[in-house]
A protein has these predicted regions:
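Membrane-interface segments of envelope glycosyltransferases acting on lipid-linked substrates or membrane lipids
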Residues: 1-158
Length: 158
């Protein structure tokens, strides 16, 4: 099984990153092929930690500044690498970018993982809601409030 864990914020010293890294370490220890996708250039100590734990790293640029270019780069990467699962970690329906890329690339399981109860981009969040709903087929939340906020009345797991 090949799993791609995507961070929609910078991979570094923050809560979402800690969750992703700890999850990746656990998966790798169980001999699962796991890759973390970062939207920033990751510092050397963190790269070394991932490598030491047999975790692959793919750095992407432009999620916020060039989202269409980012979408196609991610989609092409997904097609080339044939992941079974894409697990996107974020705070809003802007995860639709990654989920639609995964759906377009033929990834069977596309998980959105909600880590918050608000967004800094309410208009974009509302605009992307239909694409998000179309593309997601697995729903996780770090707590009940985060799940209710992002997934509304849809079923999700904490």
């Amino acid at each position: 099984m090949k799993i791609l864990l995507i961070n929609t914020v910078s991979l570094g010293a923050n809560g979402i990153s800690t969750f992703i890294i700890n999850s990746a370490i656990g998966l790798a220890k169980n001999n699962i092929n796991v890759t973390i996708a970062a939207i920033n250039r990751v510092n050397r100590p963190l790269k070394d930690k991932l490598l030491a734990n047999k975790i692959n790293l793919k750095e992407f640029q432009g999620r916020n500044s060039s989202p269409i270019k980012y979408f196609y780069a991610l989609k092409n990467y997904l097609i080339r690498n044939r992941f079974d699962v894409v697990h996107v970690n974020g705070n809003s329906t802007t995860m639709a970018i990654e989920l639609l890329a995964a759906k377009s690339a033929g990834v069977k399981l596309r998980i959105a993982h909600s880590h918050n109860t608000t967004t800094e981009h309410p208009f974009i969040n509302k605009l992307l809601r239909p694409i998000f709903e179309y593309s997601v087929n697995g729903r996780l939340a770090c707590n009940d409030a985060a799940g209710r906020w992002l997934f509304k009345r849809k079923k999700f797991d904490v």
